[in-house]
């Protein structure tokens, strides 16, 4: 990953690569694909100073808090469907600015600022996605910069 590239363009380029070379769920062991009933499960697959890769397992009904990220991110869905809602921050409230239903092979990328979203598995099967972050998850611990608890208008 060369330095100096525009973060948003880089995230979209990585998403293109993920879309073209989507791995199967077999990159996780069968027991890792189960998830957990009380929370989504992340499996960090690779981490270094330039980027990190993790797989996220979502059981039906699980969702994230509304959040943004430390750096750019790209993802591809390996199993199920992940519903994403995008938001804009107005300081004292958020507004919804978009929605997407991402199925198997769908990939996307985004970068701060303007990367506020929530992801939800509203389906009946466990969803699995692969994420690439421009963050060292080994050092940072997580990719989330901020969780939002603002009213929606």
Placement of each model-derived feature along the sequence:
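A short glycine-rich, His/Asp/Glu-containing loop-to-beta-strand
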Residues: 30-62, 107
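Short beta-strand His + acidic residue motifs that chelate non-heme Fe in jelly-roll/DSBH
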Residues: 65-67, 84-85, 110-111, 116-122
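Domain-scale activation on soluble regions of proteins
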Residues: 99, 121, 132, 139-153
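N-terminal leader/capping segments at the start of a protein or of a new domain
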Residues: 1-25
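Glycine- and acidic-residue-biased ligand/ion/polar-headgroup-sensing regions
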Residues: 71-89
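Short acidic-glycine-tyrosine-enriched beta hairpin
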Residues: 89-117
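A short hydrophobic beta-strand segment most commonly corresponding to one strand
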Residues: 74-76, 124-140
